[in-house]
Structures are given as structure tokens and as C-alpha cells.
Regions:
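Hinge/beta->alpha junction and helix N-cap segments in small-molecule ligand-binding domains
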Residues: 57, 75-84, 102-111, 164-174, ...
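Glycine-rich phosphate-binding loop signature in dinucleotide/nucleotide-binding domains
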Residues: 51, 122-124, 182-183, 237-243
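Flexible loop/turn connectors
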Residues: 240-341
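Periplasmic-binding protein-like
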Residues: 124-132, 188-191, 220-221, 241-250, ...
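Alpha-helical recognition/docking segments in bacterial nutrient-uptake
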Residues: 1-10, 69-177, 181
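Short beta-strand segments enriched in small/hydrophobic residues
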Residues: 25-28, 62-78, 178, 186-193
Length: 341
């Protein structure tokens, strides 16, 4: 075995000598070129392992004109959805051979988003994913350099930016129809905060399902994604006459609703059925276990990378919209409406 000097890390030429092949053959193996014999590929891979060879990504970037770096702009990563989406993005990017640079924003204003995009652009990222599903993020995306491959989670006002989203309205329809099919006359709704695209989609789907069924549409109760907001809404609902079904716009608010109803002596689901949205891991352990709309955030994150890489391969001017269907998980927090004496 011909070992490289201990004073420097192994380079591609060392791998070629070790495997008894040309520099070009090593390059083809590293780039997963199909025209390499299996036994030759195995020899090269064994040489790479023995020598501890690591690719020089900076040198590769000079040749390919790609940094192998993707940027992510995110808002409120303390929430389950954005955090899970970013995890899916990072895992998919790593599998594809890309690094991820993440900028987390405390406030979602135009200047903050523009500063984040400028910061990522200075790093020479090949593309950008924006995980900030609020209307106020839309104008800031105008600062994206023309031709920069970009994907927005949930939506954007720009026609040249791809979108990956879950069908929020359909998820709300699933929740509302489930309760109507159980015999409930109508369904009360605890909304998410204003400006969020998910809030709009779920409100739209809930209202549409009630109107399509010819049922009365109650005034929605305001929320902010937190259990505290759900608790306040639950106290209000417990004081109302004729409430038998509640659809909360996320599982955290549903948890607050359940707590408030329990404190008021209202039995779930015997007296009031409750449905959430997200299917967070804890929802199966609520009391009672929560019926909820399931969002596959990991799949959303992976689709973001798939769409972004397709844009990189196809060149500027290509964009697409990919919609992920929601699921629905029935547990113990919903039941047939109680008969009115």
C-alpha cells in the first residue's frame, strides 16, 4: 500500500494510486457515474475508506459552479410544524449531498426577511427555502435575486417562486365533515392567529363544509396556536348553549379546550366532541386521545428539497406547486351527538 504523506490529508491522486486506477475513474466513482465496472467501483470505494479520503467541497464548487449549500429562512421554530418541516429539509438535503444554512427570525417583517435572504445570498447558497407561512412574508420575497431557485412553504405572492403546501382547507373539511357525519348540527371553530396562511385555509375549509351541508355557521373564536388561547375558548364554549362539536385549528389549542371543558364539568366526547389539527406526537396521549387532522411535515420538508433540486437542474424560470394531502386520525375525543331530550 502506498500511503500519502502524514503531513497532509489524502487527495484524489492518492486514492487513484491506492486503487490502481486513473484520476478520472476516481472522479466518476465520486460523482456516481454509471459507466464504472462494479469491481472497479468497489476497489475505489475500499481505497477511499482505507485512506480516509474526504472530498474538497470548495474545489468541487469551483468546477461545478455550485456551493452545495442551501439556505432556509424560518419563523417561530418553537412551533411543532416549522420545526418538523426544517428537520425534513435538513435530512433530505444531507441525503442529496447539500449542507443547510438556517436563519431563524424572531419577527417576520419585510426588513428581517430581506436581511436573512441577503445574508444567505452572501454565503453563495444555490437555492432558498422560506418556512414562514404568513402573508407578511410575501412582500419580503421580492428581495430574492432574480433567477435564484426558491421554494416557499404554504404560499407566496410571487409567481416565479415554487410552493410546497399541505391542503389546509381539505384538512378542515375532513374534520368538519367527520363531526357532521356523527350527527352534530353544527361545528364551532377556534381559529389560528391572523396573517397565517394556515389560519385562512382552515377557516375556509370549515366554513365551506358547513355551508355545503346547509348548516349554520357559528362565529369563530379567536386563537393564537397556544393552549392558553384554547383554554380561553373552551371556557367560552362551555358557557354557550347547544355546543356539541368543536374544531380547533391546531392540537395545542385543542389541548386547552379539553382542559377548560374538563374543569367546567363537560364530558368529552359524551357532551362535546373535539377535533384538532396537526397530529403532534402528544395528541395520542391527551385525555381523551385526540381525533385530529394529520400533517406530514417531514414529507413537506423533503418535497421542498426535491422541488428545489429540480429547479437547479432545469435552470431559472421553472417553478411548480406541490400539494400534500392531509390525513385524518380518529381517536376517542369524538362521538355521535347526544340526543336532545
Amino acid at each position: 500500500m502506498v500511503a500519502p504523506s502524514k503531513r497532509r490529508p489524502p487527495v484524489m491522486a492518492d486514492v487513484a494510486r491506492e486503487a490502481g486506477v486513473s484520476h478520472q475513474t476516481v472522479s466518476r466513482v465520486l460523482n456516481d457515474h454509471p459507466n464504472v465496472r462494479p469491481d472497479t467501483r468497489a476497489r475505489v470505494e475500499e481505497a477511499i475508506t482505507r485512506l480516509g479520503y474526504r472530498r474538497n467541497l470548495a474545489a468541487r464548487a469551483l468546477v461545478t459552479k455550485r456551493s452545495r449549500m442551501l439556505g432556509v429562512v424560518s419563523f417561530d421554530t418553537t412551533l411543532y410544524g416549522p420545526a418538523s418541516t426544517i428537520y425534513g429539509i435538513e435530512q433530505a438535503a444531507r441525503t442529496a449531498g447539500y449542507f443547510v444554512s438556517i436563519v431563524s427570525l424572531k419577527t417576520l417583517d419585510v426588513d428581517s426577511v430581506r436581511d436573512a435572504i441577503d445574508y444567505l445570498s452572501e454565503q453563495g447558497v444555490d437555492g432558498v427555502v422560506v418556512v414562514a407561512p404568513r402573508r407578511s412574508a410575501g412582500p419580503a420575497l421580492e428581495s430574492l435575486p432574480s433567477g435564484t431557485p426558491a421554494v416557499a412553504v404554504e404560499g407566496t405572492l410571487r409567481g416565479d417562486v415554487s410552493v410546497v403546501c399541505i391542503d389546509q382547507a381539505e384538512g378542515a373539511r375532513l374534520a368538519t365533515r367527520h363531526l357532521l357525519e356523527l350527527g352534530h348540527r353544527t361545528v364551532h371553530h377556534v381559529t389560528g392567529p391572523p396573517d397565517w396562511l394556515e389560519t385562512e385555509g382552515r377557516l375556509e375549509g370549515w366554513r365551506a363544509a358547513l355551508e355545503e351541508a346547509g348548516r349554520p355557521v357559528p362565529e369563530p373564536l379567536p386563537g393564537d396556536w397556544s393552549p392558553h388561547a384554547g383554554y380561553a375558548a373552551g371556557r367560552s364554549l362551555a358557557a354557550m348553549d347547544g355546543v356539541t362539536a368543536v374544531f380547533a385549528a391546531n392540537d395545542q389549542m385543542a389541548l386547552g379546550v379539553l382542559r377548560a371543558l374538563s374543569e367546567e364539568g363537560v364530558k368529552v366526547p359524551d357532551q362535546i366532541s373535539v377535533v384538532g389539527f396537526d397530529d403532534i406526537p402528544e395528541s395520542a396521549f391527551f385525555s381523551p386521545p385526540l381525533t385530529t387532522v394529520r400533517q406530514d411535515f417531514d414529507q413537506v420538508g423533503r418535497h421542498c428539497i426535491e422541488v428545489l433540486l429540480r429547479q437547479l437542474d432545469a435552470g431559472a424560470g421553472t417553478c411548480e406547486r406541490l400539494v400534500v394531502p392531509p390525513g385524518f386520525v380518529v381517536r376517542s375525543s369524538t362521538a355521535a351527538a347526544a340526543r336532545v331530550p
